[in-house]
Amino acid sequence: VKSYANEQKAIFDGTIDVVNSMVNRVETAIKTDEKLTKEGMIEFQKNILKNNDFLYTAWIGFEDDSYLFDRYDGSDKNPYYTPKGVFQSLVTANGNGKYDLEFLPEFNKNDIYLKNAVESKKVSITEPYEYEMSGGKKVLMATVSAPIIINDKVIGVVGVDFTLEAINNAI
């Protein structure tokens, strides 16, 4: 039992490290005025999932994405924009090295996966909750997220999700 507890702690600690690396990457790019490509950000998220097979999704949500990306002009038809044109990518590992790409809903500070990170201004872990993916699939998951803070203002949140099924399988 103790070894399982240690293994689970290692997974959670690793997940927190992943989220910290995501937020550090984004904040550093903003502070150094480095324009990241949206495609590069998607690849970064895919690599996170590839290197951490217990994770289900990696995502980034912005209240204001103009700190990092040029404004959406409608010409890019990739599925990582909200209806208002904000870059909010959600990459999901669907097995066999394949990934689905969609956008998060419009940034709402009260959404369960954003709320704790926005309010605490630090890495947060949610209680398990049910989330409906764009294809209608409902998944019981938990989120580890961290705020993107520029000039003491939360402009977005990065995060990863893991399913409770994955945690149960690890035990």
PLM features: what roles do these ranges have?
Residues 1-39, 43, 47-50, 54:
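Juxtamembrane extracytoplasmic/periplasmic/luminal helical "stalk" adjacent to the first N-terminal
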Residues 5, 9, 49, 106-111, ...:
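Amphipathic alpha-helical bundle/coiled-coil segments
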Residues 6-7, 129-133, 148:
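Short beta-turn/strand-loop junction motif enriched in small, turn-promoting residues
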Residues 30-34, 100-104, 157:
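Second-shell loop/turn segments in exported
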Residues 49-123, 128-136:
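Extracellular/periplasmic ligand-sensing ectodomains of membrane signal-transduction proteins
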Residues 137-171:
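Conserved beta-strands of PAS-like sensory domains
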